[in-house]
Regions:
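Binding/recognition "hotspot" determinant
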Residues: 1-72
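Hydrophobic transmembrane alpha-helix segments characteristic of membrane transport
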Residues: 72-110, 202-216
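Alpha-helical transmembrane segments and their helix-start/interface "positive-inside/aromatic belt" motifs
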Residues: 1, 8, 12-23, 95-112, ...
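Non-cytosolic segments of integral membrane proteins
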Residues: 24, 31, 106-202, 236, ...
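Loop-to-transmembrane-helix entry motif
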Residues: 60-68, 103-107, 183, 187, ...
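Alpha-helical transmembrane segments
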Residues: 207-224, 251-253, 282-284
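Hydrophobic, aromatic-rich alpha-helical transmembrane segments
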Residues: 60-64, 95-99, 103, 160, ...
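Juxtamembrane "helix exit" motif at the C-terminal ends of alpha-helical transmembrane segments
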Residues: 70, 74-86, 236-251
Length: 288
């Protein structure tokens, strides 16, 4: 009878350990996968991310928004000419060189407006180049090795049946929680790309105001916003890299319960930091 009890206990312990390791392996595999996915997503240019969406946004920008921006530029250029004329003592001290100055500024504004889409894409090409360079370093240093899982499994084999049952229930709950948090991370990363497309679609309107001293703040703030959203990807990559390194620490700590709850705690922290990356990027570039 004692032999049967011992066999049943060992069988249940093995079953629970297998279930716990299945949940934990899924969690740690998600870390590796998430690092790779985010590195790819934030390191992809708008043109390469979704070609169909990019083509639609470009067509809307060039066929719908650009003509309106042309009207805005006409107003800005006319306003600029009036300001240049009346600022010289109401035409009493009029210098004709100001007309050449106005022609040059207007020509430059037209050139910039007609190449708005190329300028916007150049901003994101610069930011994605920086992100791509950093992604290789991050991806190579944050992978979680299988030896960490083996160390964790060895510590589980020394635990009692009751402790393993409680730990299995906790691991299952945390597995579901991590799945939900991964959806949140997905929304944040993809939401950034949607924001890039939205900014790109209306690009000609603020760019049309750049040539004017008084109205140019709109265009300047728009360019700051472009750089902020572009380099937000770098901050997202840094957050995920820090997260993966922290996960490595708890995976080798030898405390299964602490490893599980530490994993979910760090994931909640990651989601919070990802939400803050947009605010931090805008504050760095002084974008409103």
């Amino acid at each position: 009878m004692g032999f049967l009890t011992d066999w049943l206990t060992d069988w249940l312990k093995g079953l629970l350990i297998e279930g716990i390791m299945g949940n934990l392996t899924g969690l740690f595999d998600t870390v590796n996968t998430r690092v790779g996915e985010i590195a790819v997503q934030v390191g992809t240019t708008p043109a390469a991310w979704k070609a169909g969406v990019f083509s639609l946004i470009r067509q809307l920008s060039e066929t719908v928004i650009l003509p309106i921006a042309g009207l805005v530029l006409t107003f800005v250029a006319t306003y600029e000419l009036i300001q240049l004329i009346i600022e010289k003592n109401n035409l009493h001290d009029l210098d004709y060189w100001i007309f050449f100055k106005w022609i040059f500024k207007t020509a430059a504004a037209i050139l910039i407006l007609s190449n708005t889409f190329n300028i916007v894409m150049a901003v994101f090409d610069v930011s994605q180049s920086v992100i791509a360079s950093a992604a290789g370093i991050v991806q190579g240093s944050t992978d979680i090795s299988s030896s960490m899982i083996d160390t964790l499994e060895a510590s589980l084999e020394t635990m009692s049946l009751g402790a393993l049952l409680g730990l299995w229930l906790q691991s299952f709950l945390i597995h579901v929680t991590m799945w939900a948090l991964n959806i949140v991370i997905f929304v944040i990363v993809y939401g950034r790309m949607i924001e890039i497309y939205l900014l790109t679609s209306l690009a000609p309107l603020p760019v049309a105001t750049l040539s004017n001293r008084e109205l140019g703040s709109m265009g300047q703030n728009y360019l700051k916003s472009l750089f902020a959203v572009g380099f937000q990807g770098m901050l997202i990559l840094v957050c995920v890299a820090i997260y993966a390194v922290l996960i490595q620490g708890i995976a080798t700590g030898g405390d299964p319960v602490g490893a599980i709850w530490g994993c979910v705690g760090y994931t909640v922290l990651l989601c919070f930091c990802l939400f803050k990356t947009g605010t931090i990027a805008r504050s760095i570039f002084s974008a409103h």
